[in-house]
Amino acid sequence: MTAQTLYDKLWNSHVVREEGDGTVLLYIDRHLVHEVTSPQAFEGLKMAGRKLWRIDSVVSTADHNTPTGDWDKGIQDPISKLQVDTLDQNIKEFGALAYFPFMDKGQGIVHVMGPEQGATLPGMTVVCGDSHTSTHGAFGALAHGIGTSEVEHTMATQCITAKKSKSMLIAVDGKLKAGVTAKDVALYIIGQIGTAGGTGYAVEFGGEAIRSLSMEGRMTLCNMAIEAGARSGMVAVDQTTIDYVKGKPFAPEGEAWDKAVEYWRTLVSDEGAVFDKEYRFNAEDIEPQVTWGTSPEMVLNIGGKVPNPAEETDPVKRSGIERALEYMGLKAGTPLNEIPVDIVFIGSCTNSRIEDLREAAAIAKGHKKAGNVQRVLIVPGSGLVKEQAEKEGLDKIFIEAGFEWREPGCSMCLAMNADRLAPRQRCASTSNRNFEGRQGNGGRTHLVSPAMAAAAAVTGHFTDIRTMA
C-alpha cells in the first residue's frame, strides 16, 4: 500500500463521491457556527424550507461582535446586537449540539471554545465560516474556513464540494531556545516563505520543535497557517493530543474512548510518505519575533532594524516596503526594540488560552504598565479560560500591573466591536493580522507573542523578553 500523508488519510476518509474533474463531495463532521457568517445561511434554509441535516454536528457561540467590558449594559451597537440576537433566534429554531450564548460561562471565541469543549477531535473534518478555522488542525483534523454559501450547504447536506490541495511539510528541527514560543515559530515561518508560500497547500507541521509544543502552542501555529496562504494546517496526533482531549465534555468515554484512541494513533504521516513540497528550519535560528509592516511576512527578530526600501532591488517589493513604512509611521533603520507602543492587546483566537495568559502574567508580575502605554487589554478566549485564570490569580497580577482584565470575545483582533484602535495608535498585539485598518481605521499593528506583548506593556517599547529574566 502506498505510504500516505496525514492529509491523505483525513481527505480520503471523508470523500463521499468523486465528480471526475478533481472535485469531490467531502463529508463534514463538525460545523462551528458564530453570529457573523451564519445569518444568511440560516435565512437560506428558511426560504427553502430545509432543516439542519445533522443538528448534532453544530456547535455555536457568539464572539466577533460581543463586548468585552460593561456586560451589565449589554451590546450597545445596534448592528452587533442584531447579529447576536439573530444567532440566538436561529439556534432556537434550528437547534445545535451545543450553544454558548453571549454571557454564558462557556461562551468564547469559537476557535477557543471548540477545542476546550472537546467538540474538535482527531480525525474530524471541521469547518466554520471563519478563516482561522485552521486552528483545529492542531488535533490531527482537517479544518478550514468556508464562505457563507458553503455554511448553508453544510447545514443542508453535511457536505461541501472541494478540490484536494497539494501537500506540504514544514519541519522545525531541534529545540527552541528559552523565550521562543509557538507564535514566534509561526511568524518566523511566514517571514521565510511569505504570505503566499503555502497557497494551494495543506500544511503539516512536524519536527522535534513542533512535537515539543503543547496543544495551545500547536493551535497557535495552525491558526497562523492561513497567514502563510495555506488552506489548512495540521499536526499529527500523539500523546499530547490524546491527553488534552481526554475528559473534555464532548470527548468519547469508556469503550468508545478506547476505540477512538486506537484509531487516532494512526493519524500520522506514514514513513516514506511523499509531500509535494517540504521546508525544513532549524529551531536554533528562531528568536522572538516582531512584525514591522502591514503583512505578517514583514517580520524580524527583536534584534533587527526596520528595513530600508532603498536596499530592495525588486521594485514591487520596494514599493510595498515604502507604503508599509508610511502607514506604520516608521523610519528605515530604526531598531525594533526602540519602537514605543501606545496600546497592548493580549487575546484573539491565536493567543488567548490559559497558557498564553500564564506567559504574559509571568512577565507582568511585579511590574507596572509603562507611563507612555495608554491601555493594556487582557482578553481571555472564553469564559472557562477566564475562570481558570482567576483560580490561578492571574487576573490579580494583571490588575496590579495596571492592565484591564476583560470578558471573553474576539475583541481588538478586528474592528468589529467596541475594542479598537484610534488612528495612528501603535499596538503590540497577539492577534494574527496586521493589515491596514485591521484593528481600527489608521491603527498600527505589530504582531508578537503574549510574553513579548506583556514586555512591551511594562517597558513601553518592544523588548527582548530574554533580557527580563
Curated annotation (Swiss-Prot):
Q: Which SUPFAM superfamilies match?
A: Aconitase iron-sulfur domain
The broad enzyme category this protein falls into is lyase
Which Enzyme Commission number(s) are listed? 4.2.1.33
Q: Which GO terms describe its biological process?
A: L-leucine biosynthetic process
* GO MF annotation list: 3-isopropylmalate dehydratase activity; 4 iron, 4 sulfur cluster binding; metal ion binding
PROSITE patterns xrefs: ACONITASE_1 (PS00450), ACONITASE_2 (PS01244)
Q: In which pathway does it act?
A: Amino-acid biosynthesis; L-leucine biosynthesis; L-leucine from 3-methyl-2-oxobutanoate: step 2/4
Mind listing the UniProt keywords for this protein, alphabetically?
4Fe-4S, Amino-acid biosynthesis, Branched-chain amino acid biosynthesis, Iron, Iron-sulfur, Leucine biosynthesis, Lyase, Metal-binding
Keyword Iron-sulfur, does the record have it? yes
Q: How is the cofactor bound?
A: Binds 1 [4Fe-4S] cluster per subunit.
Q: Which reaction does it catalyse?
A: (2R,3S)-3-isopropylmalate = (2S)-2-isopropylmalate
**UniProt binding sites for [4Fe-4S] cluster:** 349, 410, 413
Question: What Pfam families does this protein map onto?
Answer: Aconitase
Q: List the disulfide bonds.
A: none
Classification via PANTHER family: 3-ISOPROPYLMALATE DEHYDRATASE, HOMOACONITASE, MITOCHONDRIAL-RELATED
Q: Subunit arrangement? A: Heterodimer of LeuC and LeuD.
User: What functional role does this protein have?
Assistant: Catalyzes the isomerization between 2-isopropylmalate and 3-isopropylmalate, via the formation of 2-isopropylmaleate.
Q: Which family does it belong to?
A: Belongs to the aconitase/IPM isomerase family. LeuC type 1 subfamily.
Q: This protein is called what?
A: 3-isopropylmalate dehydratase large subunit
| Lineage, highest ranks first | Bacteria, Pseudomonadati, Pseudomonadota, Betaproteobacteria, Neisseriales
